[in-house]
Amino acid sequence: MTHNPTIVLTVRHPADSIAVLEVTGEIDVDSAPALRSSAMELIRQGAPHLVLDLAPVEFCDSSGLNTMIGILRYAKDRYGSLSLAGAPSHLARLLDITGVDHLIPTYPTAAEALARIVVPEGAPAETERP
């Protein structure tokens, strides 16, 4: 578990190559770097398919949205994926207004996001592209 003054990140691994990162608190200019770092480390360590469980998020600004897009790109570069789950109404509205929900799949719950993850056959065992 990682602590920052405005964010707590909790990780679980429901399956090989998949991680759920629960985000509690506020995603802002101060806490976004911790989220980015933790997500990218999970991907590097062999979980290229990542679900961000946003249900406990109290606040998110443009730094948080930018971080989510950066994580998506990082995951895709490593044959992975990013899904968002459980976004509270204030965050779901922000994702909709900005169009981020068209870039990153969003689901009502982490369980639904996990059910939609497809690990492609023939994907490299390693998470880094050559």
Describe the function of each predicted region.
Residues 3-37:
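STAS-typified acidic loop motif
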Residues 1, 10-12, 74, 96:
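Short secondary-structure boundary/capping segments
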Residues 12, 85, 107:
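General small-molecule cofactor/ligand-binding pocket signal
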Residues 1-6, 126-130:
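Short, low-complexity, intrinsically disordered N-terminal peptides in bacterial proteins
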Residues 17, 81, 118-120:
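Long, contiguous secondary-structure blocks with strong helical propensity
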Residues 15-16, 55, 87, 111:
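Conserved catalytic submotifs in the C-terminal HATPase_c
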Residues 108-130:
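A charged, well-structured terminal subsegment
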Residues 26-104:
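Amphipathic alpha-helical interaction surfaces in cytosolic regulatory modules
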